[in-house]
């Protein structure tokens, strides 16, 4: 039943007698735990590859994606829009900012799924600094008395 070319898998919950054939496991860049090396794949096939400079660029890119996601979250707040603006324009602006923020956030999630420890830390620090700068109380002028 077991050969070097294919593996026969029988599903335990399948009541019929059919089987599936699968190719043997191939090594890949996906890791089941955090990987702390610079040879990884983030967001795109083959990027950043095994170049340390490109890995540093990937970390900076993920950091700024997370940072900008926090800025866009602040832009989509109701308090960031002028009081006299048209209600439909307010809703359209907030919806557009929320949509772009969601796209950036999903890109950050996809980058973190690479299971690279550096990418994870870049995403966390980008979100933390972005929150502190754009939504934290420390940098708001109206909260300072």
Curated annotation (Swiss-Prot):
Ranges annotated as spanning the membrane: 53-73, 106-126
One GO location term (cellular component): membrane
Membrane topology value: Multi-pass membrane protein
Compartments, as annotated in UniProt: Membrane
Molecular function GO labels: copper ion transmembrane transporter activity
Pfam families attached to this UniProt entry: Ctr
Expressing tissues: Highly expressed in roots and at lower levels in leaves, stems and flowers.
Induction: Down-regulated by treatment with high concentrations of copper.
Keywords: Copper, Copper transport, Ion transport, Membrane, Transmembrane, Transmembrane helix, Transport
Family of this protein: Belongs to the copper transporter (Ctr) (TC 1.A.56) family. SLC31A subfamily.
Primary role: Involved in the transport of copper.
Cited PANTHER family: COPPER TRANSPORTER 4, SOLUTE CARRIER FAMILY 31 COPPER TRANSPORTERS
Protein name: Copper transporter 4
Organism: Arabidopsis thaliana (Mouse-ear cress)
